[in-house]
Amino acid sequence: MSKLLKLFSIVAAFALILVGCSSTTNSGASNSGNKTKIVTSVNFYAEVAKSIAGDKAEVSSIISSTSVDPHDFEPTAQDAKNVADANIAILNGGGYDSWFEKLTANSKDIKKIDGAKLLGLKDGENEHIWYNPEVMSKVADELTKVLSEKDSSNKDFYEKNRDNYKKELSKITDKINSLKDKANGKYVLTTEPVFEYAVDSLGCKTTDQVKKLAQATEEGNDPAPQDLKTIQEQIKSKQISLIVNNVQTTNKTIEDLISLAEQNKVPVLNVTETQPDGKTYIEWMLEQYNKLEEILNGGSGEKAYHVEGAEEGHSHDHGHEGHSHEGHNHDHKDHDDEKEHKH
């Protein structure tokens, strides 16, 4: 009799698990209720999701610390579970967060919103799309569409939140547009491709040698000697009128070029690849553009610096097989207790 009771208990427990799994899959609900669960690879996409979904969804980001580099992040079992439990995933795409793409590939029922695909990014193109002023607006539109399809009774709520968020986003595009007259046609040296979308949107230019330098820095390589010599001459002659310095990646060549720029009074704008702790995406972008405005208005620029842990570039595979990225501090033991970069 006891064996039968034990067998019955096991079968009943297993049945309850199956029923629970089935109800979660069919309803699209998370374990904590009927709210849609949204997971993002990095924090600035979580910000979009929270702004639009409000209290109608649970939103979480796998990476929320400045000190973590998304290129070669290694997700934990808990990260995999969080993705598996989600209904919607927002990723950067373009190979930037390939580990997240792999996690979402294992979840058949998850709806994916891929920023790179929304922009029509091709393989091998610059994956730092959050500096493209269009991307957040496109993600907001797509998320609103997906949420409205899943939860049609709150469609007006999502659309109103989207409109409010896009109104805030317009502060960035308004700022960019206000700078175009003074920025247009100026030659800029970007130490790495991070800021290139912003450079394009401002109407600035980069020489062929600078483009090769930025790519070499990103891949952890040295530029060709002749290219380096040409860049040095472009700085001395002030053909290059601005240095855009990614503070999270450096090498000896970059340090020397920045020193040369300072000697020749070519101003420096410091930018970051990842969203600084304690700032929203919009605050982060506006802060950098405001500093650029000061330079364009005749300011001397900033003192160049590099954060603790900034090393000699990083190698990128722009496909979807992951990245090796040495320009940041990588301690993934605890996402919330990461050692922070100094900003």
Language-model features: where?
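Extracytoplasmic metal-acquisition and chelation regions
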Residues: 3-10, 17-343
